[in-house]
Amino acid sequence: MSAPFQLTSSDPSVIDPVGLAADTHEWIEAVVPGGVHETLIAAGIIAHPYVKDHEENCRWVEDRAWWYRGTVPIPVGDDPLVLTLTGVDTVADIWVNGHHVGHHASQYRPFQVTLPPIDANKAKVLIRFAPPLDGLAEPPATRAMVNAVSDFLNAAAPQNLDAEPGSGILTLDLAATRRRKGMFSWGWDFAPRIPSIGLTGPVELTRRSPIEVSHHVDTMAIGDGDSADVNVMVSTVHHDGPAPCTVDVTLTSPDGDRVSGHAQFKHGSATVDLQLDNPQLWWTHDLGKPSLYQVDIKICDKDANTIATDSGMAGIRTIEVDCSPDTDDPETDGPARHFTFILNGVPVFARGANLVPQSMLPGSVTPQQDHDLVRACRDANMTMVRVWGGGVYASDAFMTACDEYGILVWYDFMFACIDYPGDDEEFMSEVRTEADYQTRRLANHPSLALWAGGN
């Protein structure tokens, strides 16, 4: 369940509720999903930073600490309570009923924590967002790299033109490389400096399910178009302890044809092997129809009682990248290599565009806007888009639209064209957690064609 929130700000030196209570603050209604800028615009405190020189006039926003407060109803039940911040941008500390329950420092994954029992029917949630770069120092190795690039460019351009503000790595605040947040936030060649901050998604308080279920659908082989071998891998987490159980999986085609399978769990996982006759394959829109199957999963105990379910959509397709030598290449120092996407055994003419964030304020982008953007890509006859690594991961709505419209996605991990502090273990731990979350989130989208290391 979610609830309305209010917003106020403080000096960054105020770091806990005691310090906040000692100051005088005016609270305003918060725009959630959205962020601090959206809230201040709605309240008439700042003008939209896109207009005139208001980008400069609202620069103070990134130097303040921002606080959200709200009262969230507690759902009925006896299972443990789980607090989820579905969109966190970026550095946050969270209190529930006066108790600190967690710290978060990434724009690229949600915050979730299991709460201790609460003897009340509501939970008072307080969230402090620190200035995004507060307390961070620029990595020395990154500074050395940028200086070397700058020296090279200055030598190549005798007129010694100054780099434009927001022109990429030469004007970037290099401390930003230590923070898992879209690098475009601090200015790029297409973007002003407007680092977003705040709650970009709802705050939810739910009861944890005794059994958590996840699945992944993998097309193993397609036989001359008249059959397909599909593996459905199902994983469970039993919070009340392990118990013997089985899984039933059903795939339903767009025409309503069903194929089912059954398997026994072992160590929390099971794989159901299915063979589909005359499968309706997923294609890019220029090669065919992007057909999607309904996936229904049922977990049963030893007495055949249903104890958990899961569902989703899947596309039956194989995809690979042909990197074989190009024997027709005339280069004298050896042949070049192909880089061709092969979908269901057919080469794809990849044509499209790079996707940068639709807004400097990602929390204000709606699912409908994502859907309309993908439809426009299809109408422009694109077959592939690349999610650029200096921005943010694409939303579920965007990826679902790519599945439906038959658009492949080349996906960068969120790293821009700059060195990152790979020797910082705290940073690397955050990156590993992020990568695990994002790859699992996107794994079942048939539109996902490739993961790339970054920009």
Residue ranges and their predicted role:
Residues 1-385, 393, 404:
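Secreted/periplasmic carbohydrate-active enzymes, especially glycoside hydrolases
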Residues 61, 417, 447:
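Helix-terminus loop motifs that line ligand-binding clefts
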Residues 129, 352, 389, 411-413, ...:
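A cross-domain feature marking catalytic cores of carbohydrate-active enzymes
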Residues 370, 395, 431, 435:
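Aromatic/hydrophobic pocket-lining residues that form the small-molecule binding cavity
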Residues 374, 399, 435-439:
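Generic structural signal for well-ordered alpha-helices
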Residues 384-429:
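Aromatic-lined substrate-binding rim segments of carbohydrate-active enzymes
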Residues 423-442:
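Ligand-binding grooves and catalytic loops that recognize ribose/phosphate and carbohydrate rings
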Residues 437-455:
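Active-site groove signature of glycoside hydrolases
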